[in-house]
A protein has these predicted regions:
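N-terminal signal peptide c-region/cleavage motif recognized by signal peptidases
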Residues: 17-19
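Short, compositionally biased P/S/T/A/G/V-rich stretches that sit at domain boundaries
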Residues: 24-45
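Short, solvent-exposed, Trp/other aromatic-anchored flexible loops in extracytoplasmic proteins
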Residues: 88-121
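Short amphipathic, basic-aromatic surface patches that mediate peripheral association
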Residues: 53-64, 125
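Short acidic/polar inter-strand loop motif in beta-rich domains
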Residues: 81-83, 120-128
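Contiguous beta-strand segments within globular domains
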Residues: 42-57
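Short beta-strand elements
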Residues: 128-141
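Short coil-to-beta strand junction motifs in C2/discoidin
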Residues: 64-72, 132
Length: 141
């Protein structure tokens, strides 16, 4: 019986470092992520350049683990909150900019769209506390 307990304890301790790393890295409380352009309410014809702003943290490539640094993710028409214990998804609504980009050319279909920026750590997890922009609404003509 003691042998089984030791195996269970060893397995639990082995998994502990992975559980701890499954959450985002710490972020300064004064970090600010924002849109340089477009602004909330902007009406745009066709494709546009989306420009990202960040204060009190740095921008780096995905996979590079520097203190107080991360890379941008753009959420398009996303209403569900992100799970802080899972990497930010990568799909047509969750755009990754893992090369350290601070701007991107975006093509969206005509209509109203919401945009929000999220800063991800080296492994694409949101920081703790999350570093997110205000959600803005734009209209594409």
């Amino acid at each position: 019986m003691k042998f089984v307990r030791r195996i269970v304890l060893a397995a639990a301790l082995t998994c502990l470092p992975f559980a701890a790393s499954a959450q985002g890295k710490p972020a300064p409380k004064d970090a600010l992520l924002y849109f340089v352009w477009p602004q909330n309410g902007t009406v745009i014809k066709g494709g546009f350049w989306c420009r990202f702003g960040l204060r009190n943290m740095g921008v780096t490539h995905a996979g590079d683990s520097y203190p107080n640094s991360g890379h941008h993710h753009l959420l398009v028409d996303v209403n569900e909150p992100l799970n802080p214990n899972e990497p930010i998804p990568q799909d047509k609504s969750h755009l990754h900019f893992g090369a350290g980009q601070t701007e991107a050319r975006i093509e969206l279909p005509p209509g109203k769209h919401t945009l929000q920026l999220v800063l991800g750590d080296a492994d694409h997890f949101p920081f703790n506390p999350p570093v997110v922009s205000q959600k803005i609404t734009i209209t594409v003509k």
